[in-house]
């Protein structure tokens, strides 16, 4: 069983913000498998479930807002008894240039409040798919930057990266993490 979490904030006002790239990515991956999300109040998330390549996979989008994502993650992880190595979090990364993708297991949260929330409840030994959103220019406020929409050119770059992740997601299901890592760079 695999748990894939896309980080973001609920609500149409956040739908295309930089901070919601995790939601955008998980929706694209789920749509590749013809899945749709439904609200699960008991888990504080939207969820899509399927058996793909003989493996149960659960996609979630926490509805708790970014800074409380851990509340949803711990409920789903505990209910389904999912191992740490089978947890994948897709999130924005301000320290990576727009569209750059990095995969890693474990490590720090880089100041990302969604990851901090998850780390508090399950530790930091899970997998991360980091999608670069770049840094604000001219010392603009970071919170304001991540909560603003992508420019049209940034959105195109971000979507190319998301498509790259979605097109190679099957490698995760095949337990080929090294190959996935090489394909997404």
UniProtKB/Swiss-Prot annotation:
<dbReference type="InterPro" id="IPR036416">
    <property type="entry name" value="Pept_tRNA_hydro_sf"/>
</dbReference>
<feature type="site" description="Discriminates between blocked and unblocked aminoacyl-tRNA">
    <location>
        <position position="9"/>
    </location>
</feature>
<keyword id="KW-0694">RNA-binding</keyword>
<dbReference type="GO" id="GO:0006515">
    <property type="term" value="P:protein quality control for misfolded or incompletely synthesized proteins"/>
</dbReference>
<dbReference type="InterPro" id="IPR018171">
    <property type="entry name" value="Pept_tRNA_hydro_CS"/>
</dbReference>
<dbReference type="InterPro" id="IPR001328">
    <property type="entry name" value="Pept_tRNA_hydro"/>
</dbReference>
<feature type="site" description="Stabilizes the basic form of H active site to accept a proton">
    <location>
        <position position="92"/>
    </location>
</feature>
<keyword id="KW-0378">Hydrolase</keyword>
<dbReference type="GO" id="GO:0000049">
    <property type="term" value="F:tRNA binding"/>
</dbReference>
<protein>
    <recommendedName>
        <fullName>Peptidyl-tRNA hydrolase</fullName>
        <ecNumber>3.1.1.29</ecNumber>
    </recommendedName>
</protein>
<feature type="binding site">
    <location>
        <position position="113"/>
    </location>
    <ligand>
        <name>tRNA</name>
    </ligand>
</feature>
<feature type="binding site">
    <location>
        <position position="65"/>
    </location>
    <ligand>
        <name>tRNA</name>
    </ligand>
</feature>
<comment type="subunit">
    <text>Monomer.</text>
</comment>
<dbReference type="Pfam" id="PF01195">
    <property type="entry name" value="Pept_tRNA_hydro"/>
</dbReference>
<keyword id="KW-0820">tRNA-binding</keyword>
<feature type="active site" description="Proton acceptor">
    <location>
        <position position="19"/>
    </location>
</feature>
<comment type="similarity">
    <text>Belongs to the PTH family.</text>
</comment>
<dbReference type="GO" id="GO:0072344">
    <property type="term" value="P:rescue of stalled ribosome"/>
</dbReference>
<feature type="binding site">
    <location>
        <position position="67"/>
    </location>
    <ligand>
        <name>tRNA</name>
    </ligand>
</feature>
<feature type="binding site">
    <location>
        <position position="14"/>
    </location>
    <ligand>
        <name>tRNA</name>
    </ligand>
</feature>
<keyword id="KW-0963">Cytoplasm</keyword>
<comment type="function">
    <text>Hydrolyzes ribosome-free peptidyl-tRNAs (with 1 or more amino acids incorporated), which drop off the ribosome during protein synthesis, or as a result of ribosome stalling.</text>
</comment>
<comment type="function">
    <text>Catalyzes the release of premature peptidyl moieties from peptidyl-tRNA molecules trapped in stalled 50S ribosomal subunits, and thus maintains levels of free tRNAs and 50S ribosomes.</text>
</comment>
<dbReference type="GO" id="GO:0005737">
    <property type="term" value="C:cytoplasm"/>
</dbReference>
<dbReference type="GO" id="GO:0004045">
    <property type="term" value="F:peptidyl-tRNA hydrolase activity"/>
</dbReference>
């Amino acid at each position: 069983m695999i748990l894939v979490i896309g980080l973001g904030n609920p609500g149409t006002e956040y739908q295309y913000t930089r901070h919601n790239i995790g939601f955008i990515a998980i929706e694209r991956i789920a749509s590749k498998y013809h899945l749709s999300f439904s609200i699960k109040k008991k888990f504080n998330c939207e969820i899509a479930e399927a058996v793909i390549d003989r493996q149960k996979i659960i996609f979630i989008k926490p509805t708790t807002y970014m800074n409380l994502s851990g509340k949803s993650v711990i409920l789903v992880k505990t209910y389904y008894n999912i191992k740490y190595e089978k947890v994948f979090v897709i999130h924005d990364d301000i320290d990576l240039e727009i569209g750059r993708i990095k995969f890693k297991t474990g490590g720090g949260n880089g100041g990302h409040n969604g990851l901090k929330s998850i780390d508090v409840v399950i530790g930091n030994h899970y997998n991360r798919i980091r999608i670069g959103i770049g840094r604000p220019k001219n010392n603009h406020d970071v919170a304001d930057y991540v909560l603003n929409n992508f420019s049209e050119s940034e959105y195109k770059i971000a979507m190319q990266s998301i498509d790259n992740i979605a097109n190679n997601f099957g490698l995760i299901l095949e337990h080929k993490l090294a190959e996935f890592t090489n394909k997404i760079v």
